[in-house]
Design a protein with these regions (language model features):
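Conserved non-catalytic scaffold segment of RNase H-like nuclease domains
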Residues: 1-109, 123-124, 128-144, 191
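Short secondary-structure capping/turn micro-motifs that flank functional sites
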Residues: 67, 115, 150-151
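A short, structured active-site edge motif that brings together acidic residues
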Residues: 108-118
Length: 193
């Protein structure tokens, strides 16, 4: 199974306020590579609520690169790939908003939501939050650290594929589960900037 998992953390409720990003690349069902970076959000402004979630502060990102500087390396992982995210609407909205804010073109790739994969693969779980699914799968990780969340997210389709005997192709797994794999098209209606 080949795909990329992505996770963003944001500094405020605005989707263009990414302060951390991570991607992990899965090739033939194994971790092939990863990339993570702190990102200086616009004006390096943070909301206390968001700091309480991920612990990243303005001091942490004062000297961090902006999204545009991180983009070339991030884009290399995404272009032409199938990408997964846990609650993909959020992460795809962050990506689209950051691209729009920086005046950058959206890459061509497809994405699926690991919340939907988990709901179909393990419908009896109490909920399908990343922490709950991770605990069920025995994944030890520090939630709301972008790299650790991306790794935990990547484990979901791998483990669902093992459970269902569909370890070769993420799109085939998604089809078997009735989960949509859709094209990323940049900023869409309904995504707050």
């Amino acid at each position: 199974m080949d795909f990329v998992a992505i996770d963003f953390e944001t500094a405020t409720a605005r989707r263009d306020s990414a302060c951390s990003v991570a991607v992990v690349e899965i090739k033939d069902g194994s971790l092939q590579g990863s990339f993570s970076s702190l990102i200086r959000p616009p004006e390096n402004r943070y909301a206390a609520f968001n700091i309480g979630i991920h612990g990243i502060t303005p001091e942490d990102t004062a000297e961090a690169p902006g999204f545009a500087a991180v983009w070339p390396e991030l884009a290399a992982y995404l272009a032409g790939r199938v990408v997964v995210a846990h609650n993909a609407r959020f992460d795809m909205g962050v990506l689209a908003s950051c691209l729009a804010e920086a005046g950058l073109r959206a890459p061509t790739f497809f994405y699926a939501d690991t919340v939907a994969i988990a709901r179909k693969a393990w419908p009896d779980l109490e909920n399908h939050k990343l922490g709950t699914v991770g605990a069920f799968l025995g994944i030890d990780f520090h939630h709301h650290d972008a790299l650790e969340d991306a790794r935990a997210c990547a484990a979901i389709p791998l483990r669902a594929g093992e459970r269902l005997g569909e370890t070769g192709d993420l799109c085939a797994l998604a089809q078997k589960l009735g989960v949509r794999v859709q094209p990323f098209g940049g900023l869409r209606r309904g995504w707050r900037r």
